[in-house]
Regions:
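Positively charged, small/polar-rich N-terminal and surface patches that mediate targeting and assembly
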Residues: 1-39, 43-108
């Protein structure tokens, strides 16, 4: 049952990110790599305004579907915003931050 819920959550998040025009969406199954979450999603926004908008609208859209976030970090600067849904953590980044931190190398 947990895997089914997890897959539904990942699918919902990806669909919303796509609707919000996030680009370069990557999904990583990190079960066994950390004790924090099961999946990491990374996507890119075109500007700080776009990154902040993606993160805020993602949380709002998920809430409308009955999916509550545990919170978000980085909204003030919006270079890199993290939205925590428990089993899925979403990283919304500007391209410069994504290039600098290279999270794909960490989890890929």
């Amino acid at each position: 049952m947990r895997k089914l819920l997890q897959n539904s959550l990942v699918k919902a998040v990806i669909e919303i990110l796509d609707d919000l025009k996030a680009t370069d969406i990557s999904i990583f199954d990190v079960r066994g790599n950390n004790g924090i979450t099961d999946n990491m999603v990374i996507c890119t926004g075109t500007s700080s305004r776009h990154v902040g908008s993606i993160a805020q609208n993602l949380a709002e859209s998920c809430k409308q579907q009955g999916i509550e976030s545990f919170g978000s970090e980085g909204v003030e600067t919006a270079d890199w915003v993290v939205v925590d849904f428990g089993q899925v953590i979403v990283h919304v980044m500007q391209q410069e931050s994504r290039d600098l931190y290279q999270l794909e190398k960490l989890w890929g």
